[in-house]
């Protein structure tokens, strides 16, 4: 290694990495510099030395990129949640398309050099797009603060005005923090593993309805807090408590109880309505979700005699978009409340050709196949960890004729394509910017079974 810790070096940034950092070479050593942009000449200090690379802190920009902008966020550098807010937005979209190429080059699935990778679809107004927040709460000198941990640390950043967060949910979390302090509710302490640890607030774009979850180590009396919140925010329709007394980093425990209001809120996508219970997954960016799901529907190109599996179905949002176009839809999800929502949503929409089960895709689909069910269309929307090996093996043994992979992690997507391209051709990859100003992107992949 040609660098040492705390060494200060000049560096020319050759490209950007998948996490939005600048990448350069110093005496043949690969250096990652968060905050630096392609084409810039910088002065930086080595902050970490690894076996094959080093990381550095940006100290000074000697030659600035013409694509650099000044982030409007006052805590941009301190927070670290929006890794590329300093990059002009149209260039962010180009970067996200390139991230897909980088992932493919790393894993090299069959034929990757010839994949059609379409330009990333962006937002006309890429601010205040996050309809859901999950803020940690901590007490400092008797003052309750809500926010996120600074990237790579356990230091809480008090966030009062996030530029990517829905304005109403931000206003509500600010008030929640005040009320938790006012009524002296116990706030989470990592030594005692007790108190309110996290607050989730989600707003439905279509109805404007809001739901709130207090995640706490034990049941507490939130009555006074709820009374004030309901009086001040008429949009609030559901308040729930989730019990998580574990010492793990998992946000949620197994028990969720609605303590005030209705069981779910109402949302819409692709011109149909559905219900969302507090624990059910739904995309963070409702506006771009319309585009993402439209692209998924277009890519799968179903026929009326198709039998479709909607893996990782959540509340059924993607699968129900197909229910009126196919013979049958089957879906599964690991969250029982989401499956109950999916069943109720299908019933509300008048569909009798749907079937939903709680369970893991890698367990449920092989069982369905062993029972004789066959699907000729498959859509998967897995978590960032990608597809489980057991599910991949099931797909290889009995591949549906057509498949769409909706990915939120380009690295695990490229990894899974190594396996999937043994039986499928990749027609194209369409990325959609669900998270402006961050290094993350979503992608819709159209796959067709090889003959």
Swiss-Prot record:
Extract one GO BP annotation from the record. Answer: rRNA base methylation
User: Which residues does the record give as [4Fe-4S] cluster binding sites?
Assistant: 73, 79, 82, 162
**Record keywords:** 4Fe-4S, Iron, Iron-sulfur, Metal-binding, Methyltransferase, S-adenosyl-L-methionine, Transferase
Q: What is its EC number?
A: 2.1.1.-
List, from the UniProt record, the residues annotated as the active site of this protein: 408
Top-rank taxon, per record: Bacteria
Can you tell me which residues bind S-adenosyl-L-methionine?
Answer: 283, 312, 333, 381
Disulfide partners: none
Is the keyword Protein transport in the record?
A: no
| TRAM domain location | 2-60
Q: Name one molecular function that GO assigns to this entry.
A: 4 iron, 4 sulfur cluster binding
UniProt similarity note = Belongs to the class I-like SAM-binding methyltransferase superfamily. RNA M5U methyltransferase family.
- The protein in question is named Uncharacterized RNA methyltransferase gbs0448
Native species: Streptococcus agalactiae serotype III (strain NEM316)
């Amino acid at each position: 290694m040609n660098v040492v810790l705390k060494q200060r070096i000049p560096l020319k940034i050759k490209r950007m990495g998948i996490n939005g950092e600048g990448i350069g070479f110093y005496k043949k050593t690969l250096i990652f510099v968060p905050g630096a942009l392609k084409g810039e000449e910088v002065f930086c200090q080595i902050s970490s030395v690894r076996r094959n690379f080093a990381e550095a802190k940006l100290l000074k920009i000697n030659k600035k990129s013409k694509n650099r902008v000044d982030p409007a966020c006052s805590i941009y550098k301190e927070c670290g949640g929006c890794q590329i807010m300093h990059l002009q937005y149209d260039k962010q979209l180009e970067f996200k398309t390139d991230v897909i190429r980088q992932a493919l080059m790393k894993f090299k699935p069959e034929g990757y050099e010839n994949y059609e990778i379409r330009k990333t679809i962006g937002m006309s107004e890429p601010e205040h797009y996050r309809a859901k927040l999950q803020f940690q709460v901590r007490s400092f000198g008797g003052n309750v603060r809500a926010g996120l941990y600074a990237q790579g640390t356990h230091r809480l950043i008090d966030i009062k005005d996030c530029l990517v967060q829905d304005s109403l949910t931000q206003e509500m979390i600010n008030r929640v923090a005040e009320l938790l302090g006012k009524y002296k509710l116990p706030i989470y302490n990592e030594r005692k593993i007790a108190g309110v640890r996290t607050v989730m607030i989600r707003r439905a774009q279509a109805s404007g309805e809001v739901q709130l979850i207090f995640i706490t180590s034990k049941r507490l009396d939130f009555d006074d807090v709820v009374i004030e919140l309901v009086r001040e925010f008429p949009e609030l329709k559901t308040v729930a408590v989730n019990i998580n007394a574990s010492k793990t980093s998992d946000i949620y425990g197994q028990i969720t109880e609605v303590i005030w209001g209705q069981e779910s809120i109402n949302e819409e996508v692709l011109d149909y309505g559905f219900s969302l219970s507090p624990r059910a997954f739904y995309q963070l960016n409702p506006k771009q979700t319309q585009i993402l799901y439209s692209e998924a529907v277009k890519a799968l190109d179903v026929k009326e005699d198709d039998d479709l599996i909607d893996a990782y179905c959540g509340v059924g949002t993607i699968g129900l978009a197909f229910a009126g176009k196919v013979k049958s839809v089957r879906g599964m999800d690991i969250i029982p409340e989401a499956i109950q929502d999916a069943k109720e949503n299908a019933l509300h929409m008048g569909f009798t050709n749907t079937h939903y089960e709680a369970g893991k895709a890698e367990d449920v689909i092989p069982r369905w196949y062993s029972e004789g069910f066959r699907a000729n269309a498959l859509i998967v929307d897995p978590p960032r960890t990608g597809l489980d090996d057991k599910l991949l093996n099931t797909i290889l043994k009995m591949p549906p004729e057509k498949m769409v992979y909706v990915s939120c992690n380009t690295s695990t997507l490229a990894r899974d394509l190594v396996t999937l391209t043994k039986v499928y051709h990749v027609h194209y990859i369409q990325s959609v910017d669900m998270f402006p100003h961050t290094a993350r992107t979503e992608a819709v992949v159209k796959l067709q079974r090889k003959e």
